Amino acid sequence: MDNFIFHNPTRLIFGKGMIAQLSQQIPADKRIMITFGGGSVKTNGVYEQVIQALEGRDYTEFWGIESNPDISTLKKAIESGKEKNIDFLLAVGGGSVIDGTKLISAGIPYDGDAWELVKKGSAQNTIPLGTVLTIPATGSEMNNGAVISCRETHEKYPFFSSHPVFSILDPTVTFSLPDYQIACGLADTFVHVMEQYMTKTNESYLMDRWSESILRTLVQIAPQIKENKQDYHLMSEFMMSATMALNGFIAMGVSEDWATHMIGHELTALHGMTHGQTLAIVFPGTLRTLADKKRDKILQYGERIWGVTSGVPSVRVSLTIEKTEEFFRNLGLKTRLDEAGIGDDAIEEIVRRFNERGAAYGEDGDVTGEVARRILQNCKSKKETTDTEGTSMKTVILTSFKSDVRAHMLQDLLKNEGI
């Protein structure tokens, strides 16, 4: 393990009916701004529970924080918060509402333009916030991260401030979520884990097993949730998986990647794609592109999560990546750029942005603009089937990977065939 300091001060309040705890969690003398997204909280009962819990308190409401929160909307909330001397924020919604509220908490005490904070990447001076989570996905309810967009300039950047003081998670509020939103949340959770797991081998047996436990849980519950999204037990597992995937617990002392996320952010900024959907497209492409470098960890992942134990290493790597893509597809998500109507112009613009910023992601800081181009090229539609039933493994490798990785894998396969 690498050296680390772990700190997560968020109080987690979990279970049915726990929104009523709000009155005990927010000091009575606070001037509260409650932030919301659209109107779904008024149809699923969440709004009524929140208002009832805060009866008699001094609060104001701010509505309209959109998916991928936009700086123009957040500036309006910041201005309102300053005018009303707000000193406590309550985010009621999913990751976008919580992310946006984190910037609001930093923007209210800040004298300048809040976009400056986003470009800087962090803020230390904030007012406290709590959350009522309605959509499992981002883990924002128990971390200090956020992602903020500027639609005017097609930009989207990560931003770090303070952890929520508390977060309330009631699985029953997820029962009315649309299937697509659930699918994107499952994909987001899965890739959050993989960004911290799919790096180097033997850094920490414990962190690997914690990560694998979340992955195995997601693989188990995803098809069941598709059949019954109003099962309290299943949605509880989903909610806690999403929280545990990005609250720092599985990142202690290990390398992290995040290249997939940074590429995905650009797809959202340019095309408005839902975050989880971008990850379902980009992550298999990342694995295909970096299969040689990540080979040992992919083999471990394939064996422990998908039960891939037969065949030479190159075959197992290929099958593991195929199973990963199949998982996303079975959620009902697209897994190729072409399916989303994204072509070479977008790829070149993402590469340009990476190069302009001098971006370098991945556990070794080697995913540059050029590597991002290769990853995105590997996210295009397959020209031929990679179904292994009745198809030679040579064809699987030839149709699944790009030149440098493909050559290595074919050499491995030919050696094992005695050619």
Where are these regions (language model features)?
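ATP/NTP phosphate-donor binding region
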Residues: 1-88, 337
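A glycine/threonine-rich phosphate-anchoring loop and its flanking beta-alpha core
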Residues: 10, 20, 110-206, 300
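Short Gly/Thr/Asp-enriched flexible loops that form oxyanion-binding sites at enzyme active sites
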Residues: 78, 97-111, 142-143
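Glycine/serine-rich anion-binding loops at beta->alpha junctions
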Residues: 86-102, 134-140, 270-273
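Active-site segments that bind and position negatively charged phosphate/pyrophosphate groups
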Residues: 196, 200-323
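C-terminal charged capping/lid subdomain of soluble metabolic enzymes
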Residues: 308-389
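Acidic/polar low-complexity segments and flexible, solvent-exposed patches
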Residues: 390-419
